[in-house]
Amino acid sequence: ASIRDYGRGIPIQHLVDAVSKIETGGIGSQSHIPTTMAYGLKTVNFLSSEFVARSVRDGKARTVCFERGIMKDDLWETGIEEGSGTVIQFRADEEIFGKYEYHIELLDLYLRQQVCINRGLEITLNDKQYKSENGLLDLINDNLVGLPLYPPIHLRGENIEVIITHCLGLQQRVIHSFANSNYTPRGGIHKKA
């Protein structure tokens, strides 16, 4: 699999730490992502037979290669014309996962949720564009079951967003909750509040 973003790029001097050292990045270290734990890339790295991370920033690039979490190569480049951002390539370790295949329908659902939860995010998967103009409101409207009794009530704060509505004909209570961009079907403290 290969993932490319066109953001600022992981700071190249911290690239190895960002993809391989637990407790680096995320909470407290980067004010622009205060709610993440920063374990995702590290987990993918350690569960991959091959893992490559490339960061391009300010005309410089760094590419690090790992096998099962062990660094095998570290390449630094200057004078790069490529746009800023990060590229992650990996192959899931078949010794851990056996033969596997990606379930596009699950990725489709996940990516639709992500662009709604992370307003402004745009994702392309196999030439299909994912984008949400209204964030969580789009997610709610796309998943309404029955006729709404009233327009959704939408509350938004610095670190929280809540939408509430009720529908005719629905015999059970349905709560969709997310924390740190992750769907939490079994709830948690945020859902009990």
For each predicted feature, which ranges?
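Generic recognition of stable, solvent-exposed alpha-helical segments in well-folded globular domains
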Residues: 13, 17, 39, 46, ...
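Short, charged, solvent-exposed linker or helix-capping segments at domain edges/interfaces
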Residues: 63, 99-102, 175
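GHKL/Histidine-kinase-like ATPase module
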Residues: 77, 104-105, 112-115, 119-193
